[in-house]
Amino acid sequence: MNIMEEMNELLKAPIPIYSGLSGVEVKAIIKEAKLLISSRFHGVVSGLSQGVPTLCTSWSHKYVELMRDYQCEACLLDSLDGTKGVSVIDDALLNPQKYTPSKESIQHIEQKVREMWDTLL
């Protein structure tokens, strides 16, 4: 039994555990999430770009900059302060709109990406 299965057994309401999925399948699952908590850069980008309330741990400056781009600086979890992290997660579940990137910030990032590709191609 792996650590995810062990942790899942401790929950009052176990959650689905997925593995072996393609990137497209993962993105589809993220889009349906009520809340995404990720420490993987592409997972965080997927959540933010799809307007999913997204929390992340920041072990690199990339995450701080990404959250700033989406105007979601409050969505960074301090991996050294578990008590505060639990409070933020609880608040995100009760008030997801506070942790959801605005449509304007998503559109702004999408426009910047289009401009980048236009320049490159």
Range-by-range predicted roles:
Residues M1-L121:
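Active-site anion-handling motifs in enzyme catalytic cores
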